[in-house]
Amino acid sequence: TTVDDDPIEKYGSDVLNVFNWGEYIGEDVIANFEEEYGVKVNYSMFDSNEILYTKLLGGTSYDVIVPSDYMIERLMEEDMLQPLDYSYMTNLDDLDPGVVALRDEYDPDGVYSMPYFWGSVGLVYNKKNVDVNKLEELGWNILRDTEYADRIFMYDSERDSFMVALKALGYSMNTENMDEINEAYEWLCELHDTMHPAYVTDEVNDAMINNEKDIAVVYSGAAAYIISQNEDMGYYMPKEGTNVWTDSMVIPANAKNPKLANEFINFMLNYDEAMDSSIAVGYTSANKKVVETLSSEGELYDGNEAYSFDASNPKNEVFKHNDTLKKVLSDMWVRIKVR
């Protein structure tokens, strides 16, 4: 398609400012949008929700941002978002009901946010060395099974690690009960002392592809990539439940180009653009037709249990923001790692 309307007449602007995670979009998506709508996209990237929040607080104006669930909840509470204009949203039919249910937990009916990617946290394991029956029996506690000492990767994040410990103990990942949190701290200390885990972030991908360890705590998108590169790897979401999350597109309250922002959000839901992005990124698309295609026989994620994961376990939880707790867990996490 080519431009029929002058974007300045139609949207009041021919420039759109987008702030997204690094490497979190298909290679041609921005160029396609610019060409189709006759506009220029200024695209910049962040690597944590907290950096995004600091930028917004500092008054930087973006038109579309892509925070995670708990940060959207916080931005809503602080009146930092504007409602979406659903008259632009023509691509809603293929939104996955699973991601919509997640979204509704923090933004009922999607007044402010449109899901982009979603996923879970789980265990990538070497199927040759780890018995799946043992995984099912022990769940998260397999991370403290000394048979695998020196052979596990933990994700270097207090939030994800305390989630693992709290779930292993049968508690909510969002607990504010200090007795439960202290118990989780002891659980992680014992894991540190007996298992000697390596604490990693993105380098876990190549390490697991190269069979460096047997078990790793990872995000489902990273797991999907690892499995696509190494068929000996599997993905398991423990039955005690885990963190399920979504990153969604929202429009800040101070956005200068809200009409174009709504048009862009709808464009991102297109089958072709969602497909391009999901192939590039490896995370599960909010577009269920994209997920069906990529999971089907002979396709990129055929038989890949991390890409089309089952989010139906009622013990799964969405992370809730809690400033006080964040500081407590952060301090504890530092203490665990330097033991």
Regions flagged by a language model, labelled:
Residues 153-157, 161, 165, 173-238:
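Ligand-binding pocket segment of bilobal, Venus flytrap-like solute-binding proteins
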Residues 141-156, 169:
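Short loop->beta-strand "edge-of-pocket" segments that line small-molecule binding or catalytic clefts
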Residues 82-93, 113, 231-243, 252-255:
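Short beta-strand->loop
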Residues 2-12, 54, 73-118, 132-141:
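Hinge/lid segment of periplasmic solute-binding proteins
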Residues 252-313:
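Mature extracytoplasmic/periplasmic domains
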Residues 76-83, 107-111, 225-237, 299-302:
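Ligand-binding "clamshell"
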Residues 309-339:
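Conserved C-terminal helix/tail region of periplasmic/extracytoplasmic solute-binding proteins
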Residues 2-74, 78:
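Early extracytoplasmic/lumenal segment of secretory-pathway proteins
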